Amino acid sequence: MNFLWEVENPTVTTMPLNVSFANRNYDLDYDSVQPYFICDEEENFYHQQQQSELQPPAPSEDIWKKFELLPTPPLSPSRRSGLCSPSYVAVATSFSPREDDDGGGGNFSTADQLEMMTELLGGDMVNQSFICDPDDETFIKNIIIQDCMWSGFSAAAKLVSEKLASYQAARKDSTSLSPARGHSVCSTSSLYLQDLTAAASECIDPSVVFPYPLNDSSSPKSCTSSDSTAFSSSSDSLLSSESSPRATPEPLVLHEETPPTTSSDSEEEQDDEEEIDVVSVEKRQPPAKRSESGSSPSRGHSKPPHSPLVLKRCHVSTHQHNYAAPPSTRKDYPAAKRAKLDSGRVLKQISNNRKCSSPRSSDTEENDKRRTHNVLERQRRNELKRSFFALRDQIPELENNEKAPKVVILKKATAYILSVQADEHKLISEKDLLRKRREQLKHKLEQLRNSGA
């Protein structure tokens, strides 16, 4: 019941083992374990549950206790001001060489310490949300990351105790078999292990966050649709917990890539869009090793140097619809008209591209053609104007009217033509009558001549 006593007395805190972590914020630690508080009657509650199995569960009943379920994958680390929890300080002190041993047989070699730290950080310990000191049983109950929806505390404690027993056995075996190392080597390895434990103590397993394997050619990005504030606060403290054993200690680099935004753009994004920080992992080769590999290309096929994991925070903007905004006044054109507008835009773009891609000679040719066309069009208009003036002069009613419009000229000209045609028909009929009269007079004159002879 040590864990329940710690939960009931949240004000009791453990002093940090390292002096460098003096700026600890205990209020945030209290907030991190607050979801695990349950009712005051734990013993009676579980005793009642064992006695009455057939009764329906109460609203505050821990129904998952009887199933002995494993905890779910851990949540993102909570917002903390410093990395100073006693659990990972205990881990750092337990795996670091001690001064009272004087570099004797009780210390690990550098390779063994790196391997054990890698197994501890990358194994099931992080997935079970516990990082404990093997020598101290009180740290078994110290919860670093735990989902409040699940409460498989007893099963997780059993697994942790079994894991710690195996680690203690491995420590004893390695203590009896490993040769004595120098104090300088142990001091350097202890400093590196302390930095590693301080950096990756409150981290989660990367296989949970990044389900895809890490390749040298591509670095897949895992995007989550969680709340932006929670994710940004957790991504500030998120570090990679994978490090290869027997590798040169190299620092983990964390940098942020966010595009610069102006004031107007930021105001618009606050209304319609929401920023999400996406953490991506990629492998980057140090510049020193890169220069060495570039200077000696003829050394043959050698093993590529170990490159550290680099965490990048990218800026991804997802559009969120603002339902409180007034409706837009943009008109929805029908499909046919929209297709016509799109086709017109495409044709305009094609013509612009042709104009831009055409050489200067084609531009001069087009200018010459346009100039000749303008001259011919001007000549045609002048001739048409002269013909209208001539037609106006032929009409008796519009002969002296210089401001007569073209429509009036055409109408009067049509009426005048019809009247002239009617006069022509009359004159033709009169001509025919006169010709007949002439024929008759000629025939009568010949008869008179014949009778007089």
From Swiss-Prot:
GO cellular component, as recorded: axon; chromatin; euchromatin; mitochondrion; Myc-Max complex; nuclear body; nuclear envelope; nucleolus
Modified residues (Phosphoserine): S20, S76, S85, S96, S166, S174, S176, S307, S328, S343, S358, S361, S362
Presence of the UniProt keyword Flavoprotein in the record: no
Post-translational modifications: Phosphorylated by PRKDC. Phosphorylation at Ser-343 by PIM2 leads to the stabilization of MYC. Phosphorylation at Ser-76 by CDK2 prevents Ras-induced senescence. Phosphorylated at Ser-76 by DYRK2; this primes the protein for subsequent phosphorylation by GSK3B at Thr-72. Phosphorylation at Thr-72 and Ser-76 by GSK3 is required for ubiquitination and degradation by the proteasome. Dephosphorylation at multiple sites by the PNUTS-PP1 complex promotes MYC stability by preventing ubiquitination by the SCF(FBXW7) complex.
Biotechnology remark: POU5F1/OCT4, SOX2, MYC/c-Myc and KLF4 are the four Yamanaka factors. When combined, these factors are sufficient to reprogram differentiated cells to an embryonic-like state designated iPS (induced pluripotent stem) cells. iPS cells exhibit the morphology and growth properties of ES cells and express ES cell marker genes.
Record: glycosylation sites: T72
Domain bHLH: from-to ranges: 368-420
Keyword Glycoprotein assigned: yes
Keywords: Acetylation, Activator, Chromosome, Cytoplasm, DNA-binding, Glycoprotein, Isopeptide bond, Nucleus, Phosphoprotein, Proto-oncogene, Transcription, Transcription regulation, Ubl conjugation
Segments carrying motif UBR5-degron: 369-378
Gene3D superfamilies: Helix-loop-helix DNA-binding domain
UniProt cross-link Glycyl lysine isopeptide (Lys-Gly) (interchain with G-Cter in SUMO2), position: K66, K158, K163, K312
Extra facts: Alternative translation initiation from an upstream, in-frame non-ATG (CTG) codon or a downstream ATG start site results in the production of 2 isoforms with distinct N-termini, shown in this entry as isoform 2 and isoform 1, respectively.
Free-text note on domains in this protein's UniProt record: The 9aaTAD motif is a transactivation domain present in a large number of yeast and animal transcription factors.
Name recorded for this polypeptide: Myc proto-oncogene protein
Organism lineage: Eukaryota, Metazoa, Chordata, Craniata, Vertebrata
